[in-house]
C-alpha cells in the first residue's frame, strides 16, 4: 500500500512562511552591509561548489542544523551563539523557510529567510564568491 502523506511540502513551507519573516535580497544586502546579521547558507556543499556563495555566509547543511544550533549539542557551532539576526537562504527559498522555522522553534531569535533564495540574490545583482575548497598540507 502506498504511503498517504497528510501534510505535503507546500503546507509545511506555507506554515513556515506564516511564522517567520521573509526578506528580499535587497533587504539582506542592506542588513549584511551593517554587519549585524549572520547569513546562513543551508544549501548542499555541491550546490555551493557549483554556484558560488554569498560572501561571508556561514554554510550549514539542513541535516546538521539542529545539532549546530543547540548549545548543549556536542556539535554546537559558535556561529549560532551570537547576538545577531540569522538570515537563512537556500537555492530557491523553500528549504530556508523550513530551516528558519526550525531555528525559531528552537529559540534562536531573531530569524528570517531570504525569499527566492540564491537565485533571487543573483538576479538582484548580489555579490557572489567562488567556492574555495579547503586544502590540506601533505
Locations of the language-model features?
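Rhodanese-like catalytic fold shared by cysteine-dependent sulfurtransferases
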Residues: 1-37, 45-86, 94-138
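Short, surface-exposed ligand- or partner-binding patches at beta-edge/loop junctions that are enriched
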Residues: 89
Amino acid at each position: 500500500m502506498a504511503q498517504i502523506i497528510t501534510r505535503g511540502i507546500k503546507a509545511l513551507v506555507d506554515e513556515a512562511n506564516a511564522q517567520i519573516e521573509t526578506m528580499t535580497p535587497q533587504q539582506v544586502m542592506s542588513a549584511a552591509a551593517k554587519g549585524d546579521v549572520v547569513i546562513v547558507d543551508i544549501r548542499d556543499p555541491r550546490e555551493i561548489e557549483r554556484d558560488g556563495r554569498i560572501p561571508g555566509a556561514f554554510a550549514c547543511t539542513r541535516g546538521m542544523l539542529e545539532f549546530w544550533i543547540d548549545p548543549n549539542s556536542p556539535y554546537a557551532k559558535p556561529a549560532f551563539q551570537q547576538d545577531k539576526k540569522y538570515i537563512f537562504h537556500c537555492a530557491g527559498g523553500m528549504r530556508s523557510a523550513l530551516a528558519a522555522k526550525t531555528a525559531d522553534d528552537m529559540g534562536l531569535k531573531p530569524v528570517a529567510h531570504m525569499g527566492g533564495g540564491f537565485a533571487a540574490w543573483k538576479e538582484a545583482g548580489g555579490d557572489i564568491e567562488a567556492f574555495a575548497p579547503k586544502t590540506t598540507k601533505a
